[in-house]
Amino acid sequence: MEVSLAKKWEIFQKGMRAMAFDFKKEYKEFYLPKNKPQIVTVPPANYIAVRGKGDPNEEGGAYKAAIGVLYAVAYTIKMSKMGDHRIEGYYDFVVPPLEGFWWQEGVEGIDYSNKSTFNWISVIRMPDYVTKAEFDWAVAEATRKKKLDCSSAEFLTIDEGECVQIMHLGAFDDEPATVALMDEYLKANSYENDFSKTRLHHEIYLTDARKAEKDKWKTVIRHPIKKSE
């Protein structure tokens, strides 16, 4: 039976996806933890980042604008293989999930009842071959091609070090119960949280919240830790 052109294209796309480096699959210990607390040491990694303040649920707000910038730059790097610009060491990759670092002034951890006071750094991880120079190229290219101001994007290398993490299943507003499990685990194992201006509440969003019911949302929650004195 003759295979249609559309079917051939579908097979080709599946093959291309199969060859793309997927951070979630290659680094399962960081992206797919169990639903019980575990301690991990997270190595330094490069990120595209945008900083901001305020309620992430605000329609037309800074958070949603930041996400648009992040994906514009990330996909410009991913799709550079289709243009004339060549990135040394390039390999194709699945754009990793959106992540966020969150804090509030004068609060240890997160006060979920007062979202308007959130400070955040929204990030997407990049392969190691993405240097500051390649990032700068991607920002300029995304701005030019997509007619979108991407100047708010930053290139960050983040070294999280020793952390506790867990897979949270459910709505974001239900996270306090999961965080309580993390805190209990730390206490039982002679650890404590180690929040600071550079070590923050970290979330990795594995579910597209627009396409799934809240009770199906999967979010990695990660906290910096240290041994109790």
Predicted feature locations:
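Intrinsically disordered, low-complexity regions enriched in Ser/Pro/Gly/Gln/His and often acidic
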Residues: 2-3, 210
